[in-house]
Design a protein with these regions (language model features):
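Sec-dependent N-terminal signal peptides
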Residues: 4-13
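Short beta-strand His + acidic residue motifs that chelate non-heme Fe in jelly-roll/DSBH
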Residues: 73, 91-92, 114-120
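A short, N-terminal "cap"/entry segment at the start of jelly-roll beta-barrel domains
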Residues: 17-57, 137-140, 144-157
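A short hydrophobic beta-strand segment most commonly corresponding to one strand
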Residues: 108, 122-140
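Short acidic-glycine-tyrosine-enriched beta hairpin
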Residues: 95-112
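Conserved short histidine dyad/triad with adjacent acidic residue
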Residues: 59-76
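Glycine- and acidic-residue-biased ligand/ion/polar-headgroup-sensing regions
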Residues: 76-90, 94-95
């Protein structure tokens, strides 16, 4: 009986791993990897939940930004949907006022619409972004001064 128990203890983890290898399963509970500061200031983590391919042409990525982080102006060749999972952030489209986004909000951004989204000055934010397979088109840096002016206008909202 002890030998059987030992065999089960040894084999069960490998069987479980083999079962997991049969499926494409990811978790939005994972923080992901820290993103290099290429198009943002501050700390950001990206978790590629599903990467677009020939059969499914949408990327689904979880992004988490620490408080007081920026993300540059950008656009996508397809619509983008943001589902805010936790925290408080900002969202703005070009030539429109910035707004506060928070846990539970779902934002739809039309294709080719220049916009940015990130954490608020005092809170981190985590969201799932759903967008097409074409690469993000980065258009303009967000300066610390611009971000701070938006944060000042939205403070307390």
């Amino acid at each position: 009986m002890k030998k059987l128990l030992l065999i089960l203890i040894v084999l069960l983890p490998s069987t479980t791993m083999a079962q997991d290898a049969q499926y494409n399963i990811s978790s939005y509970l994972s923080e992901g990897v820290k993103a290099p500061n290429t198009h943002h200031i501050g700390e950001a983590w990206l978790n590629a939940l599903i990467e677009a391919d020939d059969d499914f042409d949408q990327n689904i990525t979880q992004a988490t930004f620490s408080a007081n982080s920026t993300l540059d102006w950008h656009k996508h060749s397809t619509p983008q949907v943001l589902v805010v999972l936790d925290g408080v952030g900002y969202y703005q489209e070009r030539d429109k006022d910035a707004v506060v986004i928070k846990k539970g909000d779902v934002v739809m951004c039309e294709k080719d619409t220049e916009h940015w989204h990130t954490s608020s000055a005092d809170n981190s934010v985590s969201y799932i972004a759903i967008y097409g397979k074409e690469p993000t088109i980065w258009t303009e840096k967000i300066t610390r001064e611009y971000y701070d002016s938006v944060a000042s206008k939205l403070k307390g909202k």
